[in-house]
């Protein structure tokens, strides 16, 4: 969905009608190859489809072949300023480069990177960030406005286009959600390149998920965006889970479990918070295309969750297991979760 142009990062297609892909980034020092590989495997297991790694120096380039050998998902090299790092990353077999051409020096250097990527069919993501806009653009607009982010992205793209390079993905990230949304809308009106969505410096797990859901979700609802990354000050695996939850909430991703639970009220007589959290965690890696409901009381529970394939509703020290709104049987509270999981296994 989203853009008209399609690029390929390894085996993942971005834009041009392809499914929305989920990305994350390693937060292990690039010199710790063993730790980085371990984290990459965890991300792949969680469903991450594209993994980015910071490549701050030549020593870090060694991480790329190690990651390529360890996981099957595409690897992106995140590079700033030094064009030689981009050239070495290409030679090392990276699937995609994140670099801003305007920050790497002369036209000769930009051409060298464009040529190296073109030879190997490696796309380049131009990653504009509200915290690192060019001085000229900041002087023009005064601060990182949506138009400033848009102008910066299109300027960097023009530097690559000058050398007949169009294998481009764009991102215009801001920590301010309205700014981020408007910047992407402006760029989407002016070009057909695939767009990588994200709210930069979104914050801790709680606030980061809220801001990312608002920003990424708003754009996807308007058919803007082709690949997403939820940035959190947390374990990167949680970024992947959050990204998929956003896609499920928008009904973009229809496979896998949809989990619903009620907010509780004075009728609730079981520890619904504990039960709901346990059910959600146990369903984390379930790939069945089902809707599961955990409700607080038997008065409204089965009826309110009639659209669910399977669910439970609390009583007084016990609860009901129901299917498609129809009651199956009653079990003690301590056996509710296991009973629910047993029924899910049968589906």
Q: What label would you give each PLM region?
A:
Residues 20-26, 51-53, 75-79, 97-99, ...:
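Hydrophobic faces of well-ordered beta-strands that scaffold small-molecule active sites
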Residues 128-129, 137-284:
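Catalytic alpha/beta core domains of metabolic enzymes, predominantly
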Residues 33, 44-67, 98-106, 168-177:
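Glycine-rich, proline-tolerant flexible connector loops at the mouths of alpha/beta enzymes
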Residues 1-25, 281:
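N-terminal amphipathic alpha-helix/helix-capping segment at the start of soluble metabolic enzymes
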Residues 58-79, 112-124, 184-195, 279-281:
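Alpha-helix-loop-beta-strand connector modules within alpha/beta enzyme cores
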Residues 70-73, 91-97, 118-121, 188-194, ...:
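Glycine-enriched alpha-helix->loop->beta-strand junction motifs that scaffold or abut catalytic
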Residues 84-125:
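Hydrophobic or amphipathic alpha-helical targeting/insertion segments
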Residues 17-35, 54, 73-81, 137-150, ...:
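Active-site mouth loops of central-metabolism enzymes
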